[in-house]
Amino acid sequence: MLFLINLLHKWLKLLNRSLNGSQMVAFTFAMLILCGSLLLMLPMASADGSSMRFIDALFTATSTSCVTGLVVVDTGHYFSWFGKLVMIVLIQIGGLGIMTLTTLLSVAVGKRINLRERLFIQESLNLNEPSGVVRLSLNVVKYALTIEFIFGTILAWHFYSALDMGLTGIAWGYWHAISAFCNAGFDLFGDYASLTGHYNDITLNLCIMALITIGGIGFTVLDDLRRNRKWKKLRLHSKIVLTASAILTFGGTLVILALEYTNP
């Protein structure tokens, strides 16, 4: 593990000399997508042991890494557990950001983050200034893993007990928690059905909605809420995001309810 971390750190330092922040973010995502594509093409990634076409693997890896949610195959039925594991790892890395995870690994092994690397992190997190980016990066990982673990545990127990899925339900719970928190839009229910077969499952839907909302408001807002509990002390950005999210969520609910109320 230490060897891989050192290798990754040296590789990023080499790229630092020739790429600016935006180019660095784009390049690392391109490499993530390429690696994901190759893994999804392996016979062990599909349920029937066949190799996925490169164009389909590339599309799937791009969709998962960029948390888009578009599919060209039935995720629940086409992929094996290895393929589903590759997908959720791509979703997690894409949701957190490669530079964020690189920062975590560097800090974990005691490596110092220089100014240029801080600028890259600033670019990847869409921040206005480089100050505090290392602290925020570490908090990003902490927030994500904590929230995903809490809701993943709830969903795992729900799948295990209420839906009687056994041990498979535990894996499903954490898989869907990560997917929902990263706003990826992927699911394992199969038949391209998403949650339509569970529209009356209150626990499942409330957890998914909460994860989508919390993940959607962004890590900078979550960090601001943690440090400033009072509305007046929040940053303008946080106030705008929270207000807009509330208006769109509840306003959209009322509009859809009014338009679809008589629809059977």
In which residue ranges do the predicted regions lie?
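Membrane-proximal intracellular helices of multi-pass ion channels
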Residues: 1-264
